[in-house]
């Protein structure tokens, strides 16, 4: 297919762009295969470059010969274009709708993007499973790297290499895979160096109504236990939902078959419920006419902060089991690709200082989301504005980033990255020039040959010139476990995501810049103090030598 076939009117003059907190701009609107561009001849006017893949929905209005297109973006931005001529407006709208909903992944911008920067590090090879295993290999002698899934034949949503107990061979893993939803047999998610306890993750067991069992599965997770120790199975579903799953062939671990494990059920809502929550929240944030009571009522009705509280509570429980009770845990919901990954990731941020650094967090995203099979292509296909909702779209990853932001806000000195880093990840998960978030799992990414045909997001982020934008000036390495508060009073609406297009950030930006300047000045003064102390110590040493007989 040629993009030209979808572009009926490639260029329109005298188009007026309206954006909140910016003066209206008149210019020329151009459509390309992947971008909507508005360019003005006025001096000091910023051009608009908008990826078609970032467009969630459009509305059309007409007043006489003037047409208006309202573009609603996946990053929650709303842009208005006033276009002279009804035919031109209809053609532009038709092209935008077609170009923003391309069916083929290989027609998306990452396959056409050519970087203008020097690639210092190939991000596709920055966080390979073998490299991550090397970090633990000296301390986890009871574990091994298995390539049982190298052809993606055992589990289509797992990567080729996974970490499993050394006592379990590949034949046993194949049998366990037939007992777990989607073939997602239990694998290592995190090893707690402090006491050797682990977090494992999987899909639900396929016990069904007949109480089916799998001795290889029991042996696998029991291999993670120390003598005389019990473990915890954290099921992210309420008990009634887990019981209903048995009628569909799913279920949960029976106590009779797993006597050394205590099962705990939590109440994290499934992904389709989260989508409605996001729609309500964004709708409320965009309503500028409501009074305080109505705003607070609509915010509460969205249940967004309730979802955050439940996810963080479950992550804290997992971290507590590991760190304070010295118990290993297995985490799963139904598929093991959504709420499971939220909990395993957040538990690691609480427990592991490395996950709070920029590269450590990138490794976490790569390991616990991309390689672990979170279906980004489905979940991030649309955002909060699209009318034709599919059942698989859901802000699971955005909720995770929001939870991270809540912890970052409570521990502002313990994270090497800042809020802008989290916002950037949100934006690129929904629309990007990079191939990192394309596809639903490693199997799909291999078939698409993303490593050969697209650029990794990490290749761009990890350049020194970009890293400076995402570095937290308050960061001081903290090797302790951090315990976030999940009290309702401690959780806040993430204004940097949900209100950034509805209020000016000018004064916040100025305050942030001033804070950075103060910190840099303080470092300079500290360096001078240290220099003077060294000089004083040298002078005192010289005086002591001269006074000695």
Swiss-Prot record:
* Keyword Cell inner membrane assigned: no
Q: Name one GO biological process term.
A: negative regulation of autophagy
GO MF terms held by the record: protein phosphatase binding
* All copies of domain GRAM, residue ranges: 4-99
Q: Which Pfam families match?
A: Myotub-related, PH-GRAM_MTMR6-like
Cellular localization per UniProt: Cytoplasm; Cell projection, Ruffle membrane; Cytoplasm, Perinuclear region; Endoplasmic reticulum
Alphabetized Gene3D superfamilies for the sequence: Pleckstrin-homology domain (PH domain)/Phosphotyrosine-binding domain (PTB)
Q: Which UniProt keywords apply?
A: Acetylation, Cell membrane, Cell projection, Coiled coil, Cytoplasm, Endoplasmic reticulum, Membrane, Phosphoprotein
- The parts of the chain that form a coiled coil are 508-542
The record gives the membrane topology as: Peripheral membrane protein
Query: Which InterPro entries does the record cross-reference, listed alphabetically?
Result: Myotubularin, Myotubularin-like_Pase_dom, PH-like_dom_sf, Prot-tyrosine_phosphatase-like
Q: Which residues carry this modification: N-acetylmethionine?
A: 1
What does the UniProt record say this protein does? Answer: Acts as an adapter for myotubularin-related phosphatases. Increases lipid phosphatase MTMR6 catalytic activity, specifically towards phosphatidylinositol 3,5-bisphosphate, and MTMR6 binding affinity for phosphorylated phosphatidylinositols. Positively regulates lipid phosphatase MTMR7 catalytic activity. Increases MTMR8 catalytic activity towards phosphatidylinositol 3-phosphate. The formation of the MTMR6-MTMR9 complex, stabilizes both MTMR6 and MTMR9 protein levels. Stabilizes MTMR8 protein levels.
Q: How does it assemble?
A: Homodimer. Heterodimer (via C-terminus) with lipid phosphatase MTMR6 (via C-terminus). Heterodimer (via coiled coil domain) with lipid phosphatase MTMR7 (via C-terminus). Heterodimer with lipid phosphatase MTMR8.
Q: Which family does it belong to?
A: Belongs to the protein-tyrosine phosphatase family. Non-receptor class myotubularin subfamily.
**Protein's name according to its UniProt entry:** Myotubularin-related protein 9
Lineage at the top is: Eukaryota, Metazoa, Chordata, Craniata, Vertebrata
